[in-house]
């Protein structure tokens, strides 16, 4: 979950979840935003959805962090399906994506102009990012990632960089 950087003015709350496909046999990370009225979420809409849906709801990542420009980072695990998808720029699994608060892709994302690549991608080659935050001084995104048998990582994801999973 994350609050809009302008929450006091706009009231938007963002929630990540494992969204099933229409058959219910696979899932992918999705982000919904809405406003709380009492104990209900109103004015809600999905602003991000991982396509294609690949997993059975594991290794979905799903951490949300806003940067100081109002972009939303969404972590995506490798979905535990053919981990090589983390290296494929036409798929969103094994990636950190960056979108605008309304779900649009920022024009300065690193793969916006690359044919065959998903414009949402910020960095790739991730196994399963489970923690993410902005550094309080540098304001850079920091992310923690589970290794397959130990070897957990702390990364500072940079635009367009490959973090190696599963080849390194």
Model-predicted regions and their roles:
Residues 2-83, 131-134, 139-147:
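Acidic, Gly/Ser/Thr-rich repeat motifs that build Ca2+-stabilized beta-propeller blades
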Residues 6-8, 30, 69, 73, ...:
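Beta-propeller domain segments
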